[in-house]
Amino acid sequence: SPRELESRLIAVHKLHRDGHAILHQPGQLAAYIVVSLPECSMSVDEYRSCLQRAVVKTCEEVQVVASIQPSDPTAVFGRHGVVAEIGIHVDNGVTSFGIFLNVSPRLDEAREIGRGMLGQKVSSLNAERVRPTQMPQVRSALIQHLCEELGYPDYHLHTGHPFLKRTRTLIHDKFANPQSA
């Protein structure tokens, strides 16, 4: 329940999108995609299928077997459970939200929220591969496959900015020790 999650210092936000409750945490790749469906000549269902196919192709690129189940258009499944959630919203033909791909999150927390609360299994690319998956490799592959699926074969991927610097300071990690927060 939302009250139980908040007691564990997990913020709960209600959103206007389809799909299940999703825990956002380190190790998860979130792709918030904004496109005009009329310009892409796509329906909402076609768009969702494009997102699913892009995730499946990304999984294949990192040697993870993934599949789509027609009965559940809001997920991509690995052999051991859901590896990606799809949650979208469309307003005046423009999409928001998108894909939430579990690369290397803590699965114990993920299994207690959303699908986990419904008894469904949750997995990650690392768990499916049984060895580390590099986030930059997954990010590049996902962007490439999204662009291909959405009809944008030409794209440029920039992963840095001269004024942005990565820091190593840990401000707050509620997953490391929930009692100390």
List the predicted regions and their residue ranges.
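A structural signal for short, well-ordered beta-strand segments
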Residues: 31-33, 74, 86-88, 99-103, ...
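A short secondary-structure junction signal
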Residues: 42-45, 87-88, 110-113
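Generic detector of bulky aromatic hydrophobic side chains
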Residues: 37-38, 54, 58, 94-96, ...
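Structural signal for conserved beta-strand scaffold positions within catalytic alpha/beta enzyme cores
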Residues: 14, 85, 124-127
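N-terminal lobe of the biotin/lipoate ligase/transferase fold
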Residues: 1-78, 82-83, 133, 163-181
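Short, conserved beta-strand/beta-arch hydrophobic-aromatic motifs that form part
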Residues: 1-6, 10-11, 83-107
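Solvent-exposed alpha-helices and their adjacent loops that cap or buttress functional pockets
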Residues: 22-23, 92-94, 117
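C-terminal accessory segment of soluble enzyme catalytic cores
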Residues: 96, 107-181
